[in-house]
């Protein structure tokens, strides 16, 4: 068996899997009905990943209200896996309270708003407490802590100092960012540099054949400064993995489809999907393999949700898919600029 080779993340010494395992879909259906609850099934998928060489897990404290992090701990314990053989990434920003049944698309009453007022965002209070709670749920330190969104109410200096302090405290090894403008990322980075604090080694963003807005500023900035790129939803919530005439129940139940405007595709987006289908047939690979391969060809390490062992094998096979310049141009040609989604 050929194992997946690890790669360096950005300008750090940290080595990760070229494809990162997205753990948002492992947890509780109370959080989202498309989430997998069966731990036997989850552990089987995760162990298959591990045995093949995919050993980088991306989660967030918010996913299933903390349960996703606990599942990673339980997985490592169940198989007696050595901690140093895996990389654990998590995120902080959204509220987490395991005494509440917070939903993926949560709304809070006024009492919950009050209770959670300091359990969300990126204040020093929340970053330190949130990281300590994540470490408890994971049962170990965090390799890469990412700010899930930018908190526009907290001063950037406070954010970066708190992130620096959780690294120095030993809870976290590296820090990264997610889903923000290039100017915001740069200002945070320059703030850390000014004071000699730890800086981001990575950036997560929504990036795929249907949404390429970060090619304007964030991606060029990241590449210029050797920041690792970790696109989430590289298959556009599965839209790039099947022909236009096919659908799934998740489209109806996942509000992210609407916020990303995947519930009402533009004609050029439909054409891109048709072209992915055509090229995949010509190359005798699946549409998922092709769309993942495109992201890989862009120098990124995509975060992929994997709900079966077959999907794991499919994602790994994408590492062997090569695309010619003509094929890339053909896939990208219909794209038209869009407004910033996230």
From Swiss-Prot:
GO MF annotation, one: aryl-alcohol dehydrogenase (NADP+) activity
Enzyme nomenclature, EC number: 1.1.1.-
Any one annotated GO CC term: cytosol
Keywords: Oxidoreductase
Induction data: By cell wall stress and the YRR1 transcription factor.
InterPro entries from the UniProt entry: AKR_Detox_Biosynth, NADP_OxRdtase_dom, NADP_OxRdtase_dom_sf
Coiled coil ranges: none
Any GO BP: aldehyde metabolic process
Pfam families in the record: Aldo_ket_red (PF00248)
Disulfide bonding pattern of the chain: none
Annotated Gene3D superfamilies: NADP-dependent oxidoreductase domain
Similarity field: Belongs to the aldo/keto reductase family. Aldo/keto reductase 2 subfamily.
Protein name: Putative aryl-alcohol dehydrogenase AAD16
Organism the protein comes from: Saccharomyces cerevisiae (strain ATCC 204508 / S288c) (Baker's yeast)
Source organism phylogeny: Eukaryota, Fungi, Dikarya, Ascomycota, Saccharomycotina
């Amino acid at each position: 068996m050929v194992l997946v080779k690890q790669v360096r993340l950005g300008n750090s010494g940290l080595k990760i899997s070229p494809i990162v395992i997205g753990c948002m879909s492992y947890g509780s259906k109370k959080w989202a009905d498309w989430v997998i609850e069966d731990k036997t099934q989850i552990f089987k998928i995760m162990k298959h990943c591990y045995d093949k060489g995919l050993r980088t897990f991306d989660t967030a404290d918010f996913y299933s209200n903390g349960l996703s992090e606990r599942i990673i701990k339980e997985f490592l314990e169940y198989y007696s896996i050595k901690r140093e053989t895996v990389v654990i990434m998590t995120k902080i920003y959204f509220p987490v309270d395991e005494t509440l049944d917070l939903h993926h698309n949560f709304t809070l009453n006024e009492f919950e708003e009050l209770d959670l007022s300091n359990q969300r965002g990126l204040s020093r209070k929340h970053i330190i407490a949130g990281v300590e709670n994540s470490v408890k749920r994971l049962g170990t330190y965090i390799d890469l802590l990412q700010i899930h969104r930018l908190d526009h109410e907290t001063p950037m200096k406070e954010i970066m100092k708190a992130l620096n302090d959780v690294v120095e405290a030993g809870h976290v090894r590296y820090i990264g960012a997610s889903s923000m403008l290039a100017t915001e990322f740069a200002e945070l980075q320059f703030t850390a540099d000014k004071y000699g604090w730890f800086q981001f080694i990575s950036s997560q963003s929504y990036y795929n054949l249907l949404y390429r807005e970060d090619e304007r500023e964030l991606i060029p900035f990241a590449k210029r400064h050797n920041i690792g790129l970790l696109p989430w939803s590289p298959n556009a919530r599965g839209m790039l993995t099947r022909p236009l005439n096919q659908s799934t129940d998740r489209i109806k139940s996942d509000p992210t489809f609407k916020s990303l405007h995947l519930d009402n595709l533009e004609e050029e987006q439909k054409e891109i999907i048709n072209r992915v289908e055509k090229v995949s047939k010509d190359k005798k690979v699946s549409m998922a393999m092709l769309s993942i391969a495109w992201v890989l060809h862009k120098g990124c390490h995509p975060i992929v949700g994997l709900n079966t062992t077959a999907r794991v094998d499919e994602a790994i096979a994408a590492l062997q898919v090569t695309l010619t310049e003509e094929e890339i141009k053909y896939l990208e040609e219909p794209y038209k600029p869009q407004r910033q989604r996230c």
